[in-house]
Swiss-Prot record:
Coiled-coil boundaries: none
GO molecular function: DNA binding; excinuclease ABC activity
Name of the gene encoding the protein in the UniProt record: uvrC
Location in or out of the cell: Cytoplasm
Entry function: The UvrABC repair system catalyzes the recognition and processing of DNA lesions. UvrC both incises the 5' and 3' sides of the lesion. The N-terminal half is responsible for the 3' incision and the C-terminal half is responsible for the 5' incision.
Protein name: UvrABC system protein C
Entry's Gene Ontology BP terms: DNA damage response; nucleotide-excision repair; SOS response
Length: 610
């Protein structure tokens, strides 16, 4: 028990109402957040002589201060608890690491609706279908829908400013509502309705309506129209035959759990309108000594209740673990959704088979993860031995990317004991240097990264500098000049020079900018982890550079044309739907853009052609 914290005096001030408590250590950091139906009873349990677990003993030993927030109801306490966990990320709470909102397919409420992928808050007017497990699943579905139901997927800024149909119309992937006369309002609305029914799982209704239209077209001797509808019917059938369909209208999440070697995997299977949309595995951060029940309860609460998740709640949640707070969770979710949400732990029939599938997927994913973690642990231990360090808990690597000195981007990737920590990857746009000066770029990114206060847990044990002696010299110079409150001598700076012909396995490592470097055997686990983090850094830098280059690509060609300033450039791109549309436009079409004279249109036309 904490020698500093006066638990007896504190407990005299605590109410027996429901609420949330936050525990702080001596440094003022929140180390645990909890909720209680009876705050006094719950908090008293921490200060008994016989505590339930070593984890609780370790927690109590660090308590310096406790804050209490009283709430009106248990539901309010549950919601507040998970918001605090998300805000403070306490080390003794089970933490959901992946906090990204799931993507949906969005059908807009425009006169001519469009299909698009959407993440986040649902402010735009329209309909949302999902959630899908990842962006790839949404893009794949959108591509499929475009082939079967050719409604537009272009941005409104492009749609409103087109004077002729785009390539999607030419290849039959869009009906071209942007240009009057290409498609009737009735036909476009009919295709939109098919999409709505299809995404709602009502494939039979889509097929029934299409078959009726095909038969009518045949009776009217409109054989081309009948053939087009026949192709559409066949496309819908091909898709629906591949899908596993459960009981019609099922709308549920199925959660399976696996737990081994102190690591948990929670696998979520998404079923909407009776179809399996996909699944995703989660590996929540689990403090040592945590029971599986706490892992599951905390995960489920964070997964559905944290405010920014923006999840669409299903009608039913299936679990393979009996929660002590199942009724409270169901009531809280129902209150949020404005309808009844059922939490089921002992399903039968199809639902039991779903649960078995989720459990099997969780176990498989956990085995794979443990194998990968074992590999990364071995590699980091080998590298620590090579570098004569007791352990490597955190490692950061930097790389620079540019094209002929333009659009320079620096990347920083982070590895911890479990491997890549992608949530902490960063890119830095480099400015104010001589184009192509990689040394100046490295100098700038290191000052921006380390020339400020850093939490103790975020100080890296090793900093890898991709580029060899010269870049290592820059890093050493930067660290020599740093005036920061943290221990700048703690990170080991290590230069990595690529081998002959940039072949993997021939890298040279440098502790100092002067003198000879050293190499590791090609089969060395220590070398493998260096190659891994260096490649991650390189890919991250290249990705950022390509995005930056693509951003300026649309405008760079126009910047060289006399008489075309920023406003006219923006108007041209907006009116023509992008640079490609402008390249394909005639002089007469360019001259129709507001603010563009016939003479300037000719100049733009010939400049883009030559």
């Amino acid at each position: 028990m904490s020698e500093i914290f006066d638990a007896k005096a504190f407990l005299k001030t605590v109410t027996s109402q429901p609420g949330v408590y936050r525990m702080y250590d001596a440094g003022g950091t929140v180390i645990y957040v909890g909720k209680a139906k009876d705050l006094k009873k719950r908090l008293s349990s921490y200060f008994r002589s016989n505590l339930a677990s070593r984890k609780t003993e370790a927690l109590v030993a660090q308590i310096q201060h406790i804050d209490v927030t009283v709430t009106h109801t248990e539901t309010e306490a549950l919601l507040l608890e998970h918001n605090y966990i998300k805000l403070y990320q306490p080390r003794y709470n089970v933490l959901l690491r992946d906090d990204k909102s799931y993507p949906f397919i969005f059908l807009s409420g425009d006169t001519h609706p469009r299909l698009a992928m959407h993440r986040g808050a649902k402010h735009a007017k329209g309909e949302y279908f999902g959630p899908f497990p990842n962006g790839y699943a949404v893009r794949e579905t959108l591509a499929l829908l475009q082939k079967i139901f050719p409604i537009r997927q272009c941005e409104n800024s492009v749609y409103r400013n087109r004077s002729r149909p785009c390539l999607q119309y030419q290849i039959g992937r869009c009906l071209g509502p942007c240009v009057a006369g290409l498609v009737s309002e009735e036909e476009y609305a009919q295709q939109v309705e098919y999409v709505r029914l299809f995404l709602s799982g009502k494939d039979d209704q889509v097929l029934t309506q299409l078959i009726a239209r095909m038969e009518k077209a045949s009776q009217d001797l409109a054989f081309e129209e009948a053939a087009r509808i026949r192709d559409q019917i066949q496309a819908v059938r091909r898709v629906t035959e591949k899908q596993f369909v459960s009981n019609a209208g099922d709308d549920l999440d199925v959660i399976g759990v696996a737990f081994d070697a102190g690591m948990a995997c929670v696998h979520v299977l998404f079923i909407r309108q009776g179809k399996v949309l996909g699944s995703r595995s989660y590996f929540p951060k689990v403090p040592g000594g945590t029971e599986l029940g706490e892992v599951v309860e905390t995960f489920v609460g964070q997964f559905y209740l944290q405010g920014s998740q923006m999840r669409t709640l299903p009608g039913e949640i299936l679990l393979d673990f009996n929660l002590s707070d199942k009724t409270l969770l169901a009531d809280s979710l129902s209150e949020l959704a404005g309808r009844r949400i059922h939490v089921q732990t002992k399903p039968r029939g199809d639902r039991a088979r779903y649960l078995k599938l989720a459990r099997t997927n969780a176990a498989t994913a956990l085995i794979t993860k443990l194998s990968q973690q074992s590999t990364i642990t071995q590699r980091l231990s080998a590298l620590a031995a090579v570098l004569k360090l007791p352990a490597i808990k955190r490692m950061e690597c930097f790389d620079i990317s540019h094209t002929m000195g333009e659009q320079t981007v620096a990347s920083c990737v982070v590895f911890d004991a479990n491997g890549p920590l992608r949530a902490e990857y960063r890119r830095y746009n480099i400015a104010g240097i001589t184009p192509g000066d990689d040394y100046a770029a490295m100098n700038q990114v290191l000052r921006r990264r380390y020339g400020k206060a850093i939490e103790e847990s975020k100080i890296p044990d090793v900093i890898l500098i991709d580029g060899g002696k010269g870049q290592l010299a820059q890093a050493k110079a930067v660290f020599a000049e740093l005036d920061v409150p943290w221990d700048k001598h703690r990170p080991l700076l290590l230069g990595v020079a690529k081998g002959a012909d940039r072949k993997a396995g021939l890298e040279t490592l440098f502790f100092e900018p002067e003198g000879e470097g050293f190499s590791l055997p090609p089969d060395s686990p220590a070398l493998h982890v260096i190659q891994h983090i260096r490649d991650e850094s390189h890919d991250h830098a290249i990705g950022g550079h390509r995005k930056k280059r693509a951003k300026v690509k649309n405008t760079s060609t126009l910047e060289t044309i006399e008489g075309v300033g920023p406003k006219r450039r923006q108007m041209l791109l907006k009116y023509m739907g992008g640079l490609q549309g402008l390249r394909n436009a005639s002089v007469e079409e360019i001259a129709k853009v507001p603010g563009i004279s016939q003479g300037l249109a000719e100049k733009i036309f010939w400049s883009l052609k030559h």
